[in-house]
Amino acid sequence: MGEEDMRKMFVKTENYRKFVSAVKAVEQRGAAEAGMMLVYGVPGLGKSHIVSSWAAETGAIFLRANKDWTPRYALSELAAALEIDGRGNSQKLFARLLKPIAANQWPIVIDEAEFTLANQAASLEKIRDISDRAENTVILIGMGNIQNDIKRYGQISSRIARVVEFLPATLEDVQSACKQLAEVEMSPELMAEIHRLSRGCMREVLNMVPVVERVAKTNRLACVGVDDLAGIPLSHDWQNRTPVTVKQSGGKRKVA
């Protein structure tokens, strides 16, 4: 086992496969103006991680909105991402951005998309203007209620060709993550326990794997099972202020 905790690797989960399938459908759309798609779900399911990894792999433009966004601010962020001169009035900046985006058909990803809906969705309307003219794909990432919020803006909602809801990770997803990311072998029972304790929250899974690795390293274990982690907290439930602990089933191992 190496000195570094947990391998740095991208795990292609069921949510990833649904997302990629939806992107392909939007790219092959019939109506050029219907070039937007929405990704939503509760926190911790890997929305930002999956889509940002896809963006890095495909050359898409990845932006993260914030509560201060205005149409001009959005254009400035887009210019910075493309390393384009962001000076001048909004009209000239819009034109400078439109040309390369249209020519290269770069998708635009906007994380924390709720913030684009302020002031009658003024910032998102500006992005929509670009998408309408460039005929490129725009991917919005938001929380569970964003779908209903966007419905209030017909000019935007009518352009959303696909909606992808991210769901809790499956047992197969967790098994893949444990096998690909951990530098120690885990028993099937332990991977099932991690799935149960995490409730399919991939963020929790990623927090638990290093704990398993530390126990394995401290106790020189080639393969870790449920009994090796009995009573050991793998994470912490901050809402209930209680540790998330492997079920008791035998002797405890030492924790580094």
What are these regions (language model features)?
Residues 37-43, 130-154:
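Sensor-1/coupling segment of RecA-like P-loop NTPase cores
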